[in-house]
Structure formats: structure tokens, C-alpha cells
Design a protein with these regions (language model features):
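Interaction-mediating elements
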Residues: 1-215
Length: 215
């Protein structure tokens, strides 16, 4: 995560973190079982009767879908897509919370956010710098979750120590989403205001270069 950056996290449907999936299922009220090293989703409150078959299962972090029902009627496929989108939204939020809280960030609601058909959640993860004499020690990174589980982040100035922690969390998010963001495609750099151009790590490519002193 760089200063003045917007990133997009796209969910790879073939990859899921089991711990996050279990928490998402609990949040959604879905029925699941754990069998050895597999998490198996048996019921997602869908209208269609699966006749005792599973909806999806995850072994390691690899997802397998029930191919029989994936090939079924168009209406059911549409319903399943809506079901999986709900899962992706909760999965996305749980992933963000898990990885950013692990490096010391805290959750902050966006009380001004009004959900739309496309944008369903928005909130901030907040971190505090420990750099000596840092004038802007508080960092808020904005997260917007779209209706299909895509995550869009937005940041402005980030102190260097928080920058490194956010980088760590973002890399873990890449792993959980099963996609690696690409510079200039999913990662977009914003123009750095003149005030911050002297900060060597607020560079065009987001690379850290300076040395910090933490009190």
C-alpha cells in the first residue's frame, strides 16, 4: 500500500482462505462441515434443493464447485451467482479486517456512506505512526466493497512505518484473493501533492527508500 494510491482486488473464484470462509459462512448463516483438511458448504440458503450434495468445498485454499449444479438451469446459475456474490462480499470484508488488524490497524465505520446497487460497503482501517516528530501520525485507508466482492482501496499520505505495515497486509490480501495486483492496472498512482513530494517514499512507483527513526 503506497501513499496516494488506489488499488483494486479482484476475487479469483478458485481460491479461498479456509479460516476466512468459515467466518463468512457463520456471518451468512450457511451450513458447512469440516472434514479433515476440507471445508464443505452444504447449504447457502438457496432456493434450489441440492439433494444432499455440496455447493462448494475448499481443500487447502483451492475451491471446487458442484459441477452438476453449475451446469443446471440458467435460473439456478443466476441464483448461485447472487449467492456467491454475497459470500464474496463477506469474504472480502473479513479478509481486510483479518490482515489489517494483524498489523495493528483498527476498524472505523464510514457513517456518511450510503450503499448503492454497485457499492455495498465502505469503511476505513486506521493506523498510527510511531515515527519520531511525524506531524501526521494518523492514517486512514478507505475500503469500498462492490456487490461482487471486488475491493477498491484509496489512500493519501501514509507515514513510512505505516506504509510498510499496510504493504504487508495488502500482500496477504493478494494471497487470500488469489490474484496479484499489477502496477498500472489494478494499482493506480495518484498525483502526489507538492507538500509531500519531499517524502522520498511518496514516489511515483510507491517504493520505500528513506530511513525512519521510531521512538
Amino acid at each position: 500500500m503506497s501513499c496516494f494510491e488506489s488499488s483494486k482486488f479482484l476475487k479469483n473464484p478458485q481460491t479461498m482462505n479456509q479460516a476466512v470462509l468459515i467466518k463468512a459462512c457463520q456471518e451468512l448463516g450457511w451450513k458447512y462441515e469440516i472434514r479433515q483438511d476440507e471445508v464443505i458448504i452444504l447449504n447457502a440458503n438457496q432456493k434450489e434443493d441440492l439433494k444432499g450434495e455440496y455447493l462448494l468445498k475448499v481443500k487447502g485454499d483451492v475451491v471446487s464447485y458442484n459441477n452438476y449444479y453449475m451446469k443446471n438451469a440458467k435460473e439456478f446459475v443466476t441464483e448461485l451467482q447472487e449467492t456467491f456474490f454475497k459470500l464474496n462480499v463477506v469474504y472480502a470484508k473479513e479478509t481486510i479486517l483479518k490482515e489489517f488488524e494483524a498489523v495493528g490497524f483498527t476498524f472505523k465505520r464510514d457513517f456518511d456512506f450510503v450503499p448503492t446497487k454497485e457499492e455495498v460497503e465502505r469503511f476505513y482501517m486506521v493506523g498510527y505512526s510511531k515515527i519520531e516528530n511525524e506531524e501526521e501520525n494518523k492514517t486512514e485507508i478507505q475500503f469500498t466493497i462492490l456487490n461482487d466482492g471486488t475491493v477498491i482501496t484509496d489512500s493519501n499520505y501514509i507515514p513510512e512505518d505505516i506504509h510498510k505495515l499496510a504493504d504487508e497486509a495488502m500482500l496477504k490480501m493478494d494471497e487470500a484473493f488469489g490474484n496479484k495486483r499489477r502496477e498500472g492496472i489494478e494499482i493506480k498512482r495518484k498525483e502526489v501533492p507538492i507538500k509531500y513530494q519531499g517524502k522520498t517514499y511518496c514516489s511515483a512507483n510507491g517504493q520505500l527508500k528513506s530511513t525512519i527513526k521510531i521512538s
